[in-house]
């Protein structure tokens, strides 16, 4: 039984215990149970256990089917069918963004690599597709080198330049500032950049909590604890993905700084939303 516990992808009590054993001892049981429910601990662990034999594209397709999500892709003629390219995507839905993108792109390319955060790197079902930097691990330098090699490869690389799920600001759901990494790597390795727009929103609760937390000056992203709950709210929905025209690396000249080019590409991504409506 103890061995099975350590195989759980989500284990609230173990996570708290590893971070602060004293905190686990004094944390009220009702709070632990609340976190388990909001993180959908049992449901996610059960789903992963039932699908442990599925990897990468097959796993994503299975999850999309389980959630009865209809993924509609447009602009697929803009997808480079071979050669290295960096696909940059807005990040409105959290984990379902990557799953739906992989489900969509799998019909055109089987050499996809998705750059994700530390936590998702431990998801074994997608270890053939997910890549990233374990910032807190002993091999962080090695993973950084591996990521550099990835950008120089001929693979289809997907990245969320914002690094965070979109927020609602001035009644508009949009990514925060995009990081410039994809611009600098596109220039360094002469890679085409493909803008991709994913249409969707989370609940009002998520955005209100994020804004309230920000107004209080709390730096910890408390709202991230609710992303699993938001994931399950996306059952029986339609997700629209639009691939824009590829942008050659030569376009990113000296007329703008890399960070400015990143925001320019971000604007092009959101302009694709208007094309979705037409």
Describe these PLM feature segments.
Residues 1-85, 98-100, 107-109, 127, ...:
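Membrane-anchoring hydrophobic helices of lipid-metabolizing enzymes
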Residues 2, 8, 12-13, 141-278:
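Non-catalytic C-terminal accessory region of glycerolipid acyltransferases
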Residues 41-43, 85-138:
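Catalytic core of membrane glycerolipid acyltransferases/transacylases, capturing the structured
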Residues 49, 62-68, 133-139, 171-172:
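Short, flexible loop segments at the rims of nucleotide/cofactor-binding pockets, characterized by
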Residues 67-73, 139-141, 223-225:
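Short gly/ser/thr-rich secondary-structure transition/capping motifs
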Residues 71, 112-114, 157, 193:
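Hydrophobic beta-strand scaffold residues
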Residues 74-76, 115-117, 133-134, 244-246:
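Conserved beta-strand termini and adjacent loop/short-helix elements that scaffold enzyme active sites
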Residues 78, 119-121, 137, 200-202, ...:
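Residue-level detector of flexible, active-site-proximal loop/helix-junction positions
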């Amino acid at each position: 039984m103890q061995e099975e516990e350590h195989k759980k992808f989500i284990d609230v009590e173990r996570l708290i215990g590893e971070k602060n054993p004293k905190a686990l001892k004094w944390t009220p049981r009702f709070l632990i149970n609340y976190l388990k429910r909001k993180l959908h601990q049992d449901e996610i662990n059960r789903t992963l256990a039932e699908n442990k034999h599925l990897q990468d594209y097959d796993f994503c397709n299975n999850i999309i089917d389980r959630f009865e999500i209809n993924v509609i892709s447009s602009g697929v003629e803009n997808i480079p069918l071979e050669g290295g390219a960096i696909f940059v995507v807005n990040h409105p839905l959290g984990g379902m963004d990557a799953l739906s993108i992989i489900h969509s792109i799998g019909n055109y390319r089987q050499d996809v690599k998705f750059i994700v955060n530390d936590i998702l790197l431990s998801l074994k079902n997608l270890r053939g597709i997910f890549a990233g930097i374990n910032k807190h691990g002993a091999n962080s330098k090695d993973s950084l080198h591996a990521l550099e090699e990835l950008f120089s490869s001929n693979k289809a690389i997907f990245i969320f330049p914002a690094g965070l799920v979109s927020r609602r600001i001035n009644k508009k759901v949009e990514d925060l500032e995009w990081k410039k990494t994809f611009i600098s790597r596109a220039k360094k390795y002469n890679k085409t950049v493909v803008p991709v727009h994913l249409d969707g929103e989370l609940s009002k609760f998520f955005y209100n909590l994020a804004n309230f937390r920000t107004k209080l000056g709390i730096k910890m992203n408390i709202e991230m604890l609710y992303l699993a709950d938001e994931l399950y709210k996306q059952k029986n929905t339609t997700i629209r993905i639009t691939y824009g025209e590829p942008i050659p690396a030569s376009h990113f000249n000296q007329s703008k700084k890399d960070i400015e080019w990143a925001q320019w590409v971000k604007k092009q991504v959101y302009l694709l939303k208007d094309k979705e409506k037409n």
